[in-house]
Regions:
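Structural signature of tandem-repeat unit edges
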Residues: 1-2, 11-27, 34-49, 58-73, ...
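Conserved, function-critical positions that sit in or immediately flank catalytic
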Residues: 54
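Consensus positions within tandem repeat domains that build extended binding/scaffold surfaces
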Residues: 4-7, 30, 102-104, 124-127, ...
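Eukaryotic protein-protein interaction scaffolds centered on beta-propeller repeats
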Residues: 75, 79-83
């Protein structure tokens, strides 16, 4: 069972709460109206960043079930990294983590380098969104999925050495990467989704010969993009190369 939508919408004076029922999931948005919440005890990990809504909530006042483990500044549940509370320039994700949850590192502007263990399979939505000082990432060699907006607005990243195991890259995943210069799309990726590389204004070269579908606005606004290696049978969506130097939709 889930928490009914809007259940706590009028309970703004609550400062402490215990949610120990058999819930399928508990989302941060379920508790977003509890502005005065200072401590919470749950039977399951809270999905999302509750601190975004409950400014008075301290890290040491969130207690959860035995499924949760804390490794230094990392909070992990069932091999999913769900929270990071550090302020390091170099972040080494603990071994054993398979999933980096949504928005875990969003807006962490002190981070310059990320090192992932080879256990990581999935990077969630907005996981590294707006990490504006990030310049280097060592990816897991077994990574298969990159979520929507995962690296959007990482303005200092010049190149992503994506492993050949990647099968899926979400929409807007690398949008507004102003320093990005070259892209080599892994062979297992067949679709470039909506606005994946939109407004990467310094992007000059893209190799994506295995891609068979390019969705709308995928490279829109990449004003320096000229050299593109494409599959001969690729299907190109509207405005995919709008405001670029690509002449025709199948320029090689």
């Amino acid at each position: 069972k889930n928490i009914p939508r809007g259940l706590f919408s009028e309970c703004r004076k609550i400062t402490m709460m215990s949610l120990t029922g058999n819930y399928a999931e508990i989302k941060a948005t379920d508790l977003r109206k509890l502005k005065n919440l200072r401590a919470v005890n749950t039977s399951k990990a809270i999905q999302g960043n509750l601190k975004e809504y409950c400014k008075n909530l301290k890290n040491n006042k969130i207690t959860v079930s035995s499924e949760m483990k804390k490794f230094g500044k990392f909070l992990i549940e069932n091999k999913k990294l769900i929270e990071y509370t550090g302020n390091s320039e170099v972040v080494k994700i603990p071994k054993g983590v398979k999933v980096i949850d949504d928005i875990v590192f969003r807006g962490e502007n002190k981070i310059r380098k990320i090192v992932m263990p080879n256990t990581v399979r999935t990077i969630g939505k907005e996981a590294f969104d707006s990490c504006e000082r990030l310049t280097e990432i060592k990816f897991s060699k077994k990574l298969t999925k990159i979520g929507d907006y995962a690296f959007s607005n990482c303005t200092r990243m010049k190149k992503y050495n994506l492993p050949k195991t990647v099968k899926s890259i979400g929409k807007c995943a690398f949008r507004w990467n102003y320093s990005l210069k070259t892209v080599n799309v892994p062979k297992k990726v067949k679709t470039i989704q909506f606005a994946t590389f939109e407004n990467c204004v310094n992007l000059k070269k893209v190799n994506m010969k295995s891609v068979t579908s390019i969705e709308r606005r995928a490279f829109c606004g990449d004003k320096k993009l000229k050299k593109v290696k494409l599959n001969k049978k690729v299907k190109v969506g509207k405005k995919a190369f709008l405001f670029t130097k690509v002449k025709g939709q199948k320029t090689i």
